[in-house]
Amino acid sequence: AAIGGSTLILITTLLLAVVYRKRSSSSKLHLMNSTSSKVEKFLEDYTHQMPTRYSYPELKKITNNFADKLGEGGFGVVYKGKLARGNLVAVKILDQSRHSESQFMNEVATLGTIHHFHLVRLLGYSFEGFRSALLYEYMANGSLEKFIFVEGDVLGWEQLYSIALGAARGIAYLHDECNRRIIHFDIKPHNILLDADFTPKVADFGLAKLWGKGSDHISITATRGTPGYVAPELWSRNLGPVTDKSDVYSFGMLLLEMAGRRRNIDVRASRSSQLYFPEWAFKLIEKGELETRLKERGSTEMGSEDEEKVRRMTKVGLWCIQYNSNDRPSMSRVVQMLEGNGDDVTNPPMPFNSTPSPGSTIAIFYRRLFVDGLTGS
């Protein structure tokens, strides 16, 4: 009887497991079908503006059966490919997750409808059920990140300055010049790509949002971006509305990393005062010692014109990361400041608030900035 009872329990458990798996599979299939219908409706609405659509078998042919992997990120894997007419492309195969749907539509809705010399071009896309992919122009030199965080000054100051100015022009176009304003929300060295001639192009619009020209702010439900580049108002709504000035903050952090040729938060810094580069750079500017100290760190000669470029990049970067978003310049103004035309950039005020109390909103922001930036969490 005991054996019979055990057998009955086992059979019942197995039957329940089978039923659960069937229901789970059915639920997943329903979700996939729902997602597929949503994306297809979106593509139908944008069809008159869309780049070329490719089938999955065509993607396999373009990438030689996904033979040449270029890299892997949070949203998928990127492969090198070649179109029939000979153009080299980067093919991003998106992960099958709830985030890939929104990233796919974000990229198509933004890059699929705009064109600018300093924005990476979306050349095509693929969507078949749960499989989606995006095809971009191929950027031979990869991301800016691998050139500014390495030992030895691979890029000269003039080249770095040109890259900074080009990236600024691309972002300014998003904010002020295209038909529908776009906030990128993830400006950082990894998302500035360089072609064979080191022309910079802003990439990765997976977190981007369209922003109506009549609106004075944008609504978001969660913090967007990468720790270390995220503006204070994105951490806490008490610090002001989210606007295009959030991108300005991120660009400022990027610009400072280019000027310092190091990460803004560097746990390997020889002195604690140099741990956070923006604060150290601000103090050096106040003392008039910026160029001298950066010369000591660099491996290439720095002439007077180079010194001017570094000084300008640093000052503009510090203006961009002002704690109060109203004190930050627009990206169009940033372009003007970088172009210079002989005019010096005025010294920025202290970008950071005075040392906050441990429980204040400001303290929470700085704790997140440092802890998340250092740990990558």
Predicted features along the sequence, with ranges:
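Intrinsically disordered, low-complexity cytosolic regulatory tails
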Residues: 4-7, 26-41, 89, 272, ...
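Pre-DFG segment of protein kinase catalytic domains
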Residues: 201-204
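Conserved catalytic-loop aspartate of Hanks-type protein kinases
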Residues: 247
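Protein kinase catalytic-loop region centered on the HRD/HxD motif
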Residues: 169-182
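Activation segment
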Residues: 207-209
